Each structure stands twice: as structure tokens, then as C-alpha cells.
A protein has these predicted regions:
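Short amphipathic
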Residues: 209-215
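Acidic (Asp/Glu)-rich catalytic clusters
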Residues: 172-175, 198-208
């Protein structure tokens, strides 16, 4: 279970001390054993009093014995403590992964704890305990019920994975969903065979259909990771004056894949926030 780190009016987190206190409280109340991961979601640096991301030094005040990973409200960044860095062997010798950045302490290559885009993948795989099929179905149906209570009758998941899509099919076959659910698997990591196996569905079966695929070409304006054609007025800490961010998925991989999908008539969603990323999409 993740810690809710939302700021007002959604939540109650107003500063970094509040975040540290929530992490410490979870560890103490649940008597978590050393080495147990502590996860949170929803902090917004722009709404914190300090107007910055919590870094490893901040989170070390919560624990030096428990790896901590907190995800930004945009989903495009995360911050971790020293225990998390040590457990994953991330240090000054770690290179930035393609499409991501490990932020560093000023004047050094030592990670400061903040991870941009694909750098989150250095940590975020297999941290959550697997959800069994019964709980998965319960959570899905409770979520649909909440949407329907607000009058929303079509729900889209633009970041699905194929294993969860298969579980959704089994669940919907057991009992039709109360709203239409359309899923688009996140396809940045699909190889050619996986992409060729996708068959988009034009109609719903038991309230579910696979709508096509989705790619992500860049990050978010909030995180200063949206790919721009002109430099940011204010980039992330330590960024060069000509900082424009970067693509999270290279054109040389995207172009042949989108051409294949268009030829096959497969609907394709593309995350492209910055104007340079939009140009990548148009030119592709």
C-alpha cells in the first residue's frame, strides 16, 4: 500500500517535513523490518513550501534502513533515499539510461535521489507485491463503480500491460463490466513480434476492448522533461542554459513502428507534451 502524498486541496502534505513524517509513521506503525521497501505517490514539488523535490538527504531523515521510493504526481519522476540507491547499486558510476536522467548532487556525479523518466525503471520493477486475481478483480470493479458514480461510462487505461489485459478479459467474461473499459498497452518496450501480435478490437466484449497501442515520446512540463524545440525559461537544478529536455523514445525506433501500425490500421495513442516531441510524431 502506497503512502498518499497529495497536497491540498486533494491531500494534506504542505512541505518536505510532512513527507518525512508520513514515511516514518508508516515504518513505525507497521513495524516494517529493515530492508522493506516504503512506497508513496502523489507529491507535487510545485505545491510544497520548499518548491523543490525531496532528495535522498531529506528521505534519509525518515530511514537509513528502509529503501524509500516516492513517485511524483505526474508519474514522470520519483525520488529515493540512500538505502534504495545502495540496494540497487546506483552510484556515481551509474550512467543515465536511454530516455532518462539520474539527477546528481551539484558539482558531482553522486545521485541526489531524484530520477527522471526511464531512470525510475532502475528501481520500480517488482517492488510491489503481486496482486492475486481475486483482489485484482475486486479493485477493478470498485474503480469502475467509482467512475460510474460520477456519470462516467467509458474508462480508458493508456498504460496497460498485456498480462493485466488478459486478467481483465477473464474478469469481464465472469461478469460484464458496468462501464465500457478500453485498454491501450504501453508499447515502448514491445519488439516487432509483440507489436505484430496486437489486434485492435472495434467492439466491446463484456464491457472490455483492446483499443490499439500507446507510445510515449517525452516527459512532462511539470518535471521539465517535456521535449522542447527552444530552451526552458527555467530548467531543472543544474541544467545548462540551452536545456530543452530529451525524447524518452528515439525517432529511429518510433518511426518504423508507427509506419507499421498505420499500415495495419491499428489505432495508436502517443504521449507527446513538448513541441519537439509533437514534431517527432508528425514527422514520423
Amino acid at each position: 500500500e502506497m503512502i498518499d502524498l497529495a497536497s491540498p486541496p486533494v491531500g494534506r502534505v504542505e512541505n518536505i517535513n510532512d513527507i518525512v513524517a508520513l514515511v516514518k509513521s508508516k515504518i513505525d506503525k507497521q513495524q516494517l523490518a529493515p530492508g522493506t521497501w516504503v512506497l508513496g505517490f502523489g507529491y507535487d514539488d510545485s505545491l510544497l513550501e520548499e518548491k523543490r523535490h525531496p532528495n535522498r538527504d531529506d528521505l534519509d531523515r525518515a530511514s537509513l534502513d528502509h529503501p524509500v521510493m516516492l513517485t511524483h504526481v505526474s508519474g514522470h519522476l520519483a525520488t529515493v533515499n540512500s538505502a534504495a540507491l545502495q540496494q540497487q547499486n546506483i552510484d556515481q558510476n551509474t550512467s543515465n539510461p536511454p530516455g532518462g536522467v539520474v539527477r546528481r548532487r551539484p558539482g558531482s556525479r553522486e545521485p541526489n535521489g531524484v530520477m527522471e523518466e526511464t531512470a525510475m525503471g532502475l528501481f520500480s520493477r517488482n517492488l510491489l507485491a503481486p496482486i492475486d486475481d481475486e483482489k485484482f478483480e475486486h479493485l477493478v470493479r470498485q474503480t469502475i463503480k467509482r467512475y460510474v458514480s460520477y456519470g462516467i461510462t467509458t474508462i480508458q487505461d493508456g498504460g496497460a500491460n498485456m498480462s493485466d489485459i488478459e486478467r481483465l478479459r477473464v474478469s469481464a467474461k465472469r461478469e460484464s463490466y458496468a462501464a465500457d473499459v478500453v485498454v491501450f498497452p504501453w508499447s515502448n518496450f514491445f519488439d516487432d513480434d509483440q507489436l505484430a501480435a496486437i489486434e485492435a478490437e472495434s467492439s466491446y466484449t463484456n464491457g472490455l476492448r483492446l483499443g490499439g497501442v500507446k507510445f510515449g515520446l517525452d516527459g512532462s512540463p511539470q518535471g521539465r522533461t517535456a521535449f522542447l524545440s527552444q530552451p526552458y525559461n527555467e530548467g531543472p537544478p543544474g541544467a545548462a542554459p540551452d536545456y530543452r529536455a530529451y525524447p524518452t523514445y528515439p525517432a529511429e525506433k518510433f518511426n518504423p513502428k508507427i509506419a507499421q501500425l498505420i499500415e495495419r490500421g491499428i489505432p495508436t495513442l502517443v504521449h507527446a507534451n513538448g513541441d519537439a516531441a509533437i514534431d517527432m510524431l508528425i514527422n514520423g
